[in-house]
């Protein structure tokens, strides 16, 4: 307040002739200085606080100061010191009860934000921390992953248990496609027709092939008949466009049927090679020459089939087969040649 600022001023009192007690200047001045210095800091803080809060009352205070100043000049220094001490005690009591709470609220409002903002800041800090940790983890050197290889080519494939499952799901099952099932060649029907014999039921396909082996004879007869038709059309004197189309169709039919017959014969030869090999292995095990049987691979079976076919061929057939083989190899080599050298030879 302005009054307190005026009271804090150090004024030397004039000597008066009244009946007041005479004080020594040194004792009074020392006491006043001690009390003034002790209360100076608190009074200045309170005055600054009130000056910032009560800006509107300053104008009125100035008018009061102008009225009070002439009356203060007549007051003795001892009375001023006593008044200052009394005012200081009263102000301490009032500030302890009234001024502390607004100060605390202001300080807390400045230092600590509102709960909503503080929670948002904490959430942002946690989120930033987690992102920083993820960044560090991604930049960190990953340990070299061990390649999982199979112990052998016959072993099952190895897959990690952490392998991600496919996100694709079959919501609607596709419609079942009708598959032809001929009861004459069905394994279930053939197993019942073998009267429950497990050895014959396991080889149902073999028995079906043996039961319907006459179809292959029909196929050979049909191929011979088609070849006769082609030769008759080719020797025809007046051929039409329809005859030409018929010759092309018959030749295509003969090629497909002959390929089917050769595939059937090749499978039969492979089956015979496997049967003979198993028979030999069983005999060797029975004689004690071997402890475990040896199973042929597909490439070995194929080589034995080719060797068997060459032994069964006649001289002309062998020459024809060797010529086809030579042309096939020469064509592959020609494709690998540069384009400029292909016509030289």
From Swiss-Prot:
A Pfam family reported for this protein in Swiss-Prot or TrEMBL: RRP36
Name of protein: rRNA biogenesis protein RRP36
Biased composition (Polar residues): 108-119
Localisation per UniProt entry: Nucleus, Nucleolus
A single GO BP: maturation of SSU-rRNA from tricistronic rRNA transcript (SSU-rRNA, 5.8S rRNA, LSU-rRNA)
Bias type Acidic residues, positions: 32-59
Keyword entries, A-Z: Coiled coil, Nucleus, Ribonucleoprotein, Ribosome biogenesis, rRNA processing
The protein's role, per its UniProt record: Component of the 90S pre-ribosome involved in the maturation of rRNAs. Required for early cleavages of the pre-RNAs in the 40S ribosomal subunit maturation pathway.
GO cellular component annotations of the record: 90S preribosome; nucleolus
Start-end of Basic residues biased regions: 143-153
Originating organism: Ajellomyces capsulatus (strain G186AR / H82 / ATCC MYA-2454 / RMSCC 2432) (Darling's disease fungus)
Source domain of life: Eukaryota
PANTHER family membership: RIBOSOMAL RNA PROCESSING PROTEIN 36 HOMOLOG (PTHR21738:SF0)
Family, similarity comment: Belongs to the RRP36 family.
Sequence ranges of Basic and acidic residues compositional bias: 16-25, 312-322, 330-345
Chain intervals for the UniProt region annotation (Disordered): 16-71, 85-167, 312-345
Subunit relationships: Associates with 90S and pre-40S pre-ribosomal particles.
Parts forming coiled coils: 219-267
């Amino acid at each position: 307040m302005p009054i307190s600022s005026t009271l804090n001023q150090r004024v030397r009192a004039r000597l008066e002739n009244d009946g007041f007690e005479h004080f020594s200047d040194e004792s009074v001045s020392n006491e006043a200085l001690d009390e003034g210095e002790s209360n100076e800091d608190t009074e200045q803080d309170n005055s600054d606080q009130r000056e910032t809060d009560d800006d509107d009352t300053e104008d009125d205070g100035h008018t009061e100061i102008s009225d009070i100043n002439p009356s203060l000049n007549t007051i003795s220094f001892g009375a001023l010191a006593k008044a200052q001490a009394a005012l200081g005690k009263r102000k301490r009591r009032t500030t302890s009860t009234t001024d502390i709470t607004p100060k605390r609220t202001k300080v807390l409002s400045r230092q600590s934000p509102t709960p909503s903002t503080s929670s948002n800041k904490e959430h942002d800090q946690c989120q930033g921390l987690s992102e920083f940790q993820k960044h560090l983890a991604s930049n960190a050197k990953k340990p070299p992953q061990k390649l999982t290889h199979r112990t052998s080519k016959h072993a099952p494939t190895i897959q990690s248990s952490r392998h991600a499952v496919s996100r694709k799901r079959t919501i609607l099952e596709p419609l079942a496609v009708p598959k032809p099932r001929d009861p004459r060649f069905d394994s279930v029907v053939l197993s019942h027709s073998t009267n429950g014999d497990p050895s014959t039921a396991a080889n149902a396909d073999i028995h079906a092939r043996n039961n319907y082996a006459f179809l292959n004879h029909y196929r050979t007869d049909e191929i011979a008949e088609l070849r006769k038709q082609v030769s008759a059309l080719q020797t025809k004197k007046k051929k039409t466009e329809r005859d030409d189309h018929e010759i092309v169709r018959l030749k295509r039919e003969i090629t497909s049927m002959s390929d089917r017959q050769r595939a059937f014969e090749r499978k039969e030869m492979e089956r015979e090679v496997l049967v003979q090999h198993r028979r030999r292995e069983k005999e060797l095990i029975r004689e004690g020459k071997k402890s475990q049987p040896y199973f042929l691979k597909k490439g070995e079976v194929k080589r034995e089939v080719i060797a068997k076919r060459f032994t069964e061929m006649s001289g002309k057939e062998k020459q024809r087969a060797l010529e086809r083989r030579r042309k096939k190899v020469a064509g592959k080599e020609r494709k690998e040649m540069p384009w400029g050298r292909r016509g030289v030879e």
